[in-house]
Amino acid sequence: MKRWSIITGIVIIFCILTCKGQVENKKVDFRTEKGKFVPLNLVPGDVVEYSCPYSLNNDIRNMNGVEREHFDNKKFCFDYIFVGSKLTFLKEYVRGSYNVVHKEEGNLYTSQFSVPPVVLTHRNFDCFCYMEENNVVVKKVLRIHISNGVLRKIPGCDFNADYKESTAITTFSNMSPRRVKVCDVYPKSGDFISLMCPSDYSIKPDGCFSNVYVKRYPNEEVKEEDRFNLNRKWDASKYNVVSIETVLKMNMITQGDKYSIFSKLPDVKDQVDFTCICQSNDEQDNLMMNVYINNTSYLTNNTRSIGVNKHSFSNSEIFERIEREEISFAFSSYLSITLILLYLFFLNF
């Protein structure tokens, strides 16, 4: 009896120490789901896969004309989602969604996407599956809720000009690639940073932010007129590609794909500069993201900067809140462990 009590206590302690904040891969397959309505809660970083054996050529119940048109054009999840009754592009509604892929095998349609590590506001949307059940085509609903993780926009550059400003999660967003070629951000240690490119561009260098561009001549003076010129051109001859470990003396964990990339800056005390770009598929256009870590000189000396009033230079308040939560969790975890051990101790007497 005593031995089983000790084993039970160890299992509980293990769960307390390991079950917090785990990223999950979640699957919803309507071939095996019995109910017609499936709620699914996600958090930043989760990966979800959805499968539906579509039957669209039969008599379909509960489908209005608008839905029928979208489904005839195969505008399925997760490329497209329903927010209320409105068909919406996932990458616009959940900014920074990445690895959005789908495949078809016969009538089975399977799609997957990764929730970005930064979600500014709660997101709610539906996926509709029309499938045959008992010789009748019925409508089944996957209702997804994504919990938010931060309270303020993060330092970053989003060059998707056609997306709604209301769904933006970065300090610079909805910038037209035709008019704006450069975006400068000034994060601090601990901040998330992000670069998001249009669908006909891709992020360079490969593996950004693990690999970055740095100036070949870092002490070269930047001309005053260039500093505020948002149309200044990218000149690859002035940069080298290096590992971020070379720049920061430590690695950074990145998440994303060739269109959207995220990273959380480590604890860096020094002033550090680096660059990543969005390059058009024909390699004729480049959109620059310049990152200036722990650099406040531009703010104090150059308040004339275009867009500086829009730019929120740090989301440190967010991390102060998160750190307090983590400290609180750590304390409660140790308290729980202490109580369990005391319980086991007195149980043995």
Curated annotation (Swiss-Prot):
- Domain of life, per lineage: Eukaryota
Q: Would you list which residues are glycosylated?
A: N294, N295, N301
**Got any disulfides in this one, which pairs?**
C77-C127, C157-C183, C197-C278, C208-C276
Lipid-acceptor residues (GPI-anchor amidated asparagine): N315
> Would you indicate the residue range of the signal peptide?
1-21
Q: Which residues form the propeptide?
A: 316-349
Q: Mind telling me which InterPro entries this protein's record contains?
A: 6_CYS_dom, 6_CYS_dom_sf, Parasite_Repro/Invasion_Surf
Q: Which controlled-vocabulary keywords does the entry list?
A: Cell membrane, Disulfide bond, Glycoprotein, GPI-anchor, Lipoprotein, Malaria, Membrane, Repeat, Signal
Protein name according to UniProt = Merozoite surface protein P38
Organism for this UniProt entry: Plasmodium falciparum (isolate 3D7)
